[in-house]
A protein has these predicted regions:
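Sensory modules in modular signal-transduction proteins
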Residues: 2-38
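Conserved micro-motifs of the catalytic ATP-binding
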Residues: 189-194, 233-236
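Short conserved segment of the HATPase_c
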Residues: 284-296
Length: 347
């Protein structure tokens, strides 16, 4: 700050208190001053650098020129792609100013709206996905009803009977989707509330396995449960933990060929309890593992719809795990199977 007067230093100190990033350019569009927030975001050595080397955004650079030429404040959206996506609302104010008295200088105020942008995009994508997921069964139901009402099946009871299972299947698919959406919405609203009930994880898992007894037998799958202790006590929400293990065991069954095994193990590590659910199924390609807990993400959409998946099950699992302050790790290899490892803090 050796080149600034006492008044200018006080102005800089004031700007340092702002959460927004403030960058001041001289007439050559080089940075002559930046506040602490800007240094923290874009680097400690900003002074002397060209603005184009710090923020590579064509709209911003064009707006700086416009602000200088028209001597008017310009407001523009700025997107930074690397190293991480950032979204700013930039206000570009033409100089001169107290901190740079050159005629063609400008002050840039950057308001970080990255999280707002992500939330809006998330909502937009979510609505689009829900619309798409509902449209397919609705079209099937509409087509079936039109055929019964106006087509060749109008007076043909046998033909009508053929359409009824299809209508019931698609109605059930919609019902499951809506149920999962409501469940996910409720979990997200309450995710910050940590459960306080003392529960035995092993008892919950045995309960879920018992519920799946018939489908396990039908698919000729065996379940191997190992646990060194009789009880594994954590603080949890019983119904939601049942939902977690229902989703994971259900997936293990659906994506495993007949005659295979599902391995479930529980280990108490003093401060935490680890549950592993491993199958010998089709596995997940490595490039998709990090995405499978995203809403509506499917590795194989055709297979998922064939087995009745909504694409929301693992998203529900992730949010319930978060609510329990637990961690989830996923390991998988194509053709060999998938393992979900959940680590819960002990009560």
């Amino acid at each position: 700050m050796n080149n600034f007067s006492e008044t200018q230093i006080q102005d800089i100190k004031f700007l340092d208190e702002l959460l927004d990033q403030v960058i001041i350019l001289d007439k050559s569009k080089n940075i002559c001053c930046a506040n602490k927030s800007a240094h923290k975001r874009f680097g400690s050595q900003l002074e002397g650098k060209s603005i184009s080397s710090v923020l590579r955004d064509a709209k911003l650079l064009d707006s700086i020129e416009t602000s200088i030429n028209q001597k008017k404040t310009q407001i523009v959206d700025v997107e930074v792609k690397k190293p991480n996506f950032q979204f700013y609302k930039a206000s570009i104010i033409p100089g001169p100013s107290k901190l740079c008295n050159q005629e063609q200088s400008v002050i840039i105020f950057l308001k970080d709206l990255t999280e707002v942008f992500k939330t809006q995009k998330f909502k937009s994508d979510f609505v689009a996905n829900v619309s798409h997921e509902l449209r397919t069964p609705l079209q099937s139901i509409k087509l079936g009803l039109e055929t019964i009402n106006q087509g060749h099946a109008t007076n043909d009871f046998e033909s009508q009977k053929k359409f009824l299972p299809i209508l019931l299947q698609q109605t059930s698919r919609m019902e499951t989707l809506v149920s999962d959406l409501l469940s996910l919405s409720k979990i997200e609203l309450e995710e910050h509330i940590r459960p306080t009930d003392k529960l035995d994880l092993k008892e919950i898992i045995l309960h879920v396995v018992e519920i799946h007894k018939q489908i396990i037998k039908k698919n000729d799958i065996s379940v191997d449960i190992k646990g060194e202790e009789s009880k594994y006590i954590i603080l949890g929400h019983r119904d939601r933990l049942i939902e977690v293990f229902t989703n994971l065991i259900d997936n293990a069954i659906k994506y495993s060929p007949k005659g295979k095994k599902i391995y479930i193990s529980l280990v108490n590590n003093n401060e935490s309890t680890t549950v592993s659910i491993r199958d010998e199924g089709i596995g997940i390609p490595k490039k998709y593992i990090s995405r499978i807990t995203e809403r509506f993400f499917r590795v194989d959409p055709a297979k998922s719809k064939e087995v009745g998946g909504t694409g929301l099950g693992l998203a529900i699992v992730k949010h319930i795990v978060n609510q329990h302050r637990a961690e989830i790790d996923i390991k998988s290899e194509e053709g060999k199977g998938t393992e979900f490892i959940l680590t819960f803090p002990n009560s």
